[in-house]
Regions:
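C-terminal regulatory/interaction module of P-loop NTP-utilizing enzymes
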Residues: 1-200
């Protein structure tokens, strides 16, 4: 048995993107320090797939923001309709980023949980298109910003630790994202500005 059972792989943003694109049916949980690009990776995934993007700020969601019960008088049942912001009502693939999932309220996280099922993931009563990409973001425990994840969630996802970009990686990203040339030159001159407390 491996001695590294409890260690998570550490990747850069490009590696995380490539893993997600190569395995769209797996729910990845990207953890890293604040500001490393976990959330903005959603735009890269949207560009790569051409799918619509649904950015969900989980800490600001309440139960009524996820789905609502609707009465079906004809069949004498209730149906659960998800919020249109998730984009799954179109029946087309979508990129869904459950941003800061680990800071959401427990009832909200539990309500989002059916999205992580291996067979027929859904939200409310609607199934998510099989080509859709869903991923979660959160911070490291050492950041001390209130992240928590239940064990039954951990069993359904793959955790990746996303490290901060180095200056070469950041400059390649900045070049394609409209960042000021002055700021790019400064980062090129002072690459230590991207150093992390984890580096020491």
């Amino acid at each position: 048995m491996s001695a590294l059972v409890n260690e998570m792989p550490t990747v850069n943003l490009m590696q995380a993107k490539n893993r997600i694109l190569a395995n769209p049916d797996i729910i990845y949980f990207l953890r890293g320090e604040p500001g490393v690009g976990k959330s903005s990776l959603a735009l890269e995934l949207q560009r790569a797939t051409g799918y619509p993007l649904s950015m969900m700020d989980v800490p600001n969601l309440d139960l009524g923001d996820i789905a609502m019960p609707i009465i079906d008088h004809e069949n004498k049942v209730t149906r659960y309709y998800p919020n249109a912001r998730f984009g799954i009502h179109t029946g087309e693939p979508v990129v869904i980023c459950l941003d800061e999932f680990t800071k959401g309220a427990d009832p909200v996280k539990n309500m989002l949980h059916p999205m992580f099922e291996v067979f027929m993931p859904r939200l409310g009563d609607l199934h998510i298109h099989e080509d859709s990409i869903t991923y979660l973001t959160g911070n490291l425990d050492t950041d001390g910003v209130g992240d928590g994840l239940a064990q039954h969630t951990r069993q359904r996802i793959i955790e990746l630790i996303v490290r901060k970009p180095n200056s070469d990686e950041w400059l390649a990203w900045a070049l394609n994202n409209g960042i000021s040339p002055i700021l790019m030159a400064w980062v090129d001159r002072y690459p230590q500005c991207l150093e992390s407390y984890l580096d020491g």
